[in-house]
Amino acid sequence: MARPRKSEHASANAKLIDAFWACLEDHRLTDITISAITKSAELNRGTFYYHFRDIDDLTARAIEVEFNSQALLPGIFDLIAGAPGSITAIELVQQRMQRLSLLIDRGGLDVLSMQIKRLVRQTWTAILCAEGESLKPETLFIIEYTTSGIIGLIASETMRASSQTSPDALNGFLAHNSAFLLEQIGNAQGVPRNIILERIHATRRVSRLNAKR
């Protein structure tokens, strides 16, 4: 069987991802099947397995595509790092997380949380470490703890029919949390706070440029 052309490969991949989100409109994540995906995408099972190992692989890829298309990683990372002028948690949910909010509502919080933590760890590694180096265990503990809290806030806002949270109160909490985070990470990793902030600003610029491409 001939390999699909690049344009056909991209088209089938996108159709399967769109079909995943369409199925999620009516079903919980654990109830979605490959048959339902291929039927919605009007593709066969062979095409599915050419692109993805299983539903978990498709879910992870769908989340990654959504992160890139909605510039979600810069937004979430800005929240965690307390970057000046960053979007609020409420704005992030309301403006950029419609599909991921649906995933949370359909029982996918654990899957989404795992993907967010992986991407955030990668970003902090790029900021704090030279090539070939790794984050120290103490730094990883701090990042894991803080990221879990931010994800909890996002999930809480997602599950509210209409948010009653005061943006000022939430912003104040996040600012306090960010100051603590930068101090603790700097101490654990041995990087001065001003250097961390400089690298965060540089990373934000690169992330936003990539998101616009």
Predicted region positions:
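C-terminal peripheral helix-coil segments that are non-catalytic and often amphipathic
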Residues: 156-213
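Amphipathic alpha-helical packing segments from all-alpha helical-bundle domains
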Residues: 87-88, 108-133, 137-154, 168, ...
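Secondary-structure edge/capping motif, primarily at the C-terminal ends of alpha-helices
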Residues: 74, 100-103, 127-131, 157-161
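Short, hydrophobic secondary-structure boundary micro-motifs
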Residues: 32-33, 101-103, 112
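Terminal, non-globular segments
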Residues: 51, 120, 124, 180, ...
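An amphipathic alpha-helix adjacent to DNA-recognition modules
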Residues: 10-21, 25, 30-34, 39-42, ...
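Short Lys/Arg-rich basic patches
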Residues: 1-6
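Amphipathic alpha-helical segments that line or abut small-molecule/effector binding pockets
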Residues: 79-101, 144, 152, 171
